[in-house]
């Protein structure tokens, strides 16, 4: 008899012993308590080199889901680019050189934009510094930087020291300037909130209500208003000539390597077919370079990604299982695009259900997000499928607010939903595995008691509903082989990691 299985991916829920600032440990979680006490479980590494990131680098949702589906460690953006820097290949990149030559030939400024922080989730400031050096050494005379405040993968108000470092570098070059500043809330939305994105886009064009002559002064002004890095209101530098802001035929480099929050802004610049929304102030450029491939965006790509040819979902489909992917908007791409290897796969006998995420400024005010609706939908249609991958976004998205009380509430709401799924699974003869893609909710305060809004390097859980098996510890790349093993299916030779189910000798 074919087994039926649900893989529940809890976004941003790591395991940490200390209780201070721990939204998981401080929450009332009778369901999780029972699962840990009575069911097979183990620890899963979800950060650093274990998931293809630099040593000590916190995990993230994209990398986590890629590794979960791949069955091997997937080296992604930051590792690929860092290696190019290490070997010197970065400074031979033909796509960058093409953009530089276009700037030199036309006399138009090189426009470089991206998330400015050492967070390493969507971008890294070291890559920007390297680009500036590369452009200068190649002979680019005029360069404009369009910086997006982070405040999420790093501290909420942490950008000033890095801006000061950047200013020191820019002093070496007469026409290299910070042309605009905006928060990632505007420039890196992924939830089709184009009213926000257009404000960030307009700042690239030199159109914004807010202005500055000194970036540090503007940051201080925003802080005085209670605005953190993530939410910086788009502003432009009055010292930059109006004609030097982004315009027709200007070369552009977008130094974000992670695609999901880069696609909407890229779409507005390039006017692709990816979304219906069109910019009110369109421009045209044929020289647009992305660090890595942004799915659906036709542009020059600086670095090729590692390919996942035979992900878990593809093998499940080939085995004749009817499968479902279920998540809310914030994590829908992760249970489809990313877990399928970073491509849009059309799998036989496979359905996708998207539950709309609440359109709010802060999930701290709505820690339930769409967890109840996701569970309701599973209970409504789940019995029609053999294999289900689903995601709960609460711990991650609420954890990003740094609000401990809200994070505790999010975890408690999630615990209740997991309880509903446990009951349903037993009634419908389903088994389940519960894991997470990375940590977050378990650390909402730093060592000084200030809010921590970033991911963590703590391990995550793997829990099985089947009391007849035993699990050993591993990493996210072990999960696909474990599921295939449990379902009695062979893993693909590409999957060089083993099942975590302990076999009797």
Swiss-Prot record:
Cross-referenced SUPFAM superfamilies: 2,3-Bisphosphoglycerate-independent phosphoglycerate mutase, substrate-binding domain, Alkaline phosphatase-like
Source taxon at top rank: Bacteria
Catalytic residue list: 61
Sequence positions that bind Mn(2+) 1: 396, 400, 455
Pathway noted in the entry: Carbohydrate degradation; glycolysis; pyruvate from D-glyceraldehyde 3-phosphate: step 3/5
Record function comment: Catalyzes the interconversion of 2-phosphoglycerate and 3-phosphoglycerate.
Family: Belongs to the BPG-independent phosphoglycerate mutase family.
Protein name according to UniProt: 2,3-bisphosphoglycerate-independent phosphoglycerate mutase
Lineage: Bacteria, Bacillati, Mycoplasmatota, Mycoplasmoidales, Metamycoplasmataceae
Gene: gpmI
């Amino acid at each position: 008899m074919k087994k039926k299985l649900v893989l529940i991916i809890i976004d941003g829920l790591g395991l940490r012993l200390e209780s201070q600032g721990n939204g998981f440990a401080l929450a009332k979680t009778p369901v999780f308590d029972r699962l840990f006490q009575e069911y097979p479980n183990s620890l899963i590494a979800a950060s650093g080199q274990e998931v293809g990131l630099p040593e000590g680098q916190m995990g993230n949702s994209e990398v986590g889901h890629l590794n979960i589906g791949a069955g091997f460690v997937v080296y992604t953006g930051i590792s690929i680019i860092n290696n190019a820097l290490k070997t010197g290949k970065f400074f031979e990149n033909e796509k960058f050189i093409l953009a530089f030559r276009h700037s030199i030939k036309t006399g138009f400024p090189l426009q470089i934009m991206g998330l400015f922080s050492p967070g390493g989730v969507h971008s890294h400031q070291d890559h920007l510094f390297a680009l500036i050096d590369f452009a200068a050494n190649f002979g680019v005379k005029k360069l404009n930087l369009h910086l997006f405040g982070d405040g999420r993968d790093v501290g909420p108000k942490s950008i000033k020291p890095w801006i000061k470092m950047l200013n020191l570098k820019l002093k070496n070059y007469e026409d290299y300037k910070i042309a605009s500043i905006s928060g990632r809330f505007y420039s890196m939305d992924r939830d089709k909130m184009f009213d926000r994105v257009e404000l960030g886009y307009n700042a690239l064009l030199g159109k914004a209500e807010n202005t500055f002559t000194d970036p540090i002064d503007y940051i201080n002004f925003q802080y005085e208003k209670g605005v953190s890095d993530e939410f910086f209101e788009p502003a432009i530098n009055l010292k930059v000539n109006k004609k030097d802001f982004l315009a027709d035929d200007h070369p552009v480099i977008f130094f974000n390597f992670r695609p999901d929050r880069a696609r909407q802004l890229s779409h507005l610049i390039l006017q692709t077919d990816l979304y219906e929304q069109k910019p009110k102030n369109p421009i045209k450029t044929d020289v647009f370079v992305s660090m890595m491939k942004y799915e659906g965006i036709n542009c020059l790509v600086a670095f090729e990604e590692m390919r996942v040819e035979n992900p878990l979902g593809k093998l499940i489909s080939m085995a004749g299982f009817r499968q479902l992917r279920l998540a809310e908007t914030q994590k829908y791409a992760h249970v489809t695009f990313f877990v399928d290897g970073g491509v849009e796969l059309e799998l036989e006998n496979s359905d996708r259900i998207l539950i709309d995420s609440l359109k709010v400024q802060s999930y701290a005010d709505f820690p339930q997000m769409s967890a109840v609706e996701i569970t309701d939908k599973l209970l409504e249609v789940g019995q029609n499928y053999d294999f289900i991958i689903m995601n709960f976004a609460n711990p991650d998205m609420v954890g990003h607010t740094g609000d401990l009380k809200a994070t505790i509430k999010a975890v408690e709401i999630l615990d209740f939903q997991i309880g509903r799924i446990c009951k349903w699974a037993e009634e419908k003869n389903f088994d389940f595995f519960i894991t997470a893609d990375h940590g977050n909710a378990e650390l909402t305060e730093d060592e000084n008691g200030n809010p921590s809004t970033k991911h963590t390097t703590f391990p995550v859980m793997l829990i099985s509903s089947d009391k007849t098996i035993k699990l050993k510890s591993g990493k996210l790349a072990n999960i696909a082989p474990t599921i295939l093993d449990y379902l009695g299916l062979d893993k693909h030779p590409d999957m060089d990691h083993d099942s975590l189910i302990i076999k009797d000798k």
